[in-house]
């Protein structure tokens, strides 16, 4: 499993964290001061990398959380058909079928960049 554990205090905006078992990119990170009877708390807000949903959690800053290792890979578009495209990974030469994002109009032989985590892929 490509995940590692980190303390909440080590997280930063722009990094990835598992929120509700979904890899998410941190959009907001804030901490509260320690109180008389408790430790400092951190509020982390993020957006799902693959589904785009907003999620958040609040935990003590010394709590451990899972951080996904999201791989950024290069690929070449082999063919385009409807809403899908076939992409060849430039490292392993494996052919993958992926959805075409709305803001992208790929053509054959275009090179693209995509994110991969535990079998999920998304064109960036």
Swiss-Prot record:
Gene3D superfamilies: 2.30.30.30, Nucleic acid-binding proteins. One of its GO terms (biological process) is positive regulation of translational termination. SMART domains: eIF-5a. Residues 27-53 are annotated as: Disordered. The keyword Protein biosynthesis applies. It is found in: Cytoplasm. Keywords: Cytoplasm, Hypusine, Initiation factor, Protein biosynthesis. The keyword Hydrolase does not apply. GO terms for molecular function: ribosome binding; RNA binding; translation elongation factor activity; translation initiation factor activity. Belongs to the eIF-5A family. Functions by promoting the formation of the first peptide bond. This is Translation initiation factor 5A.
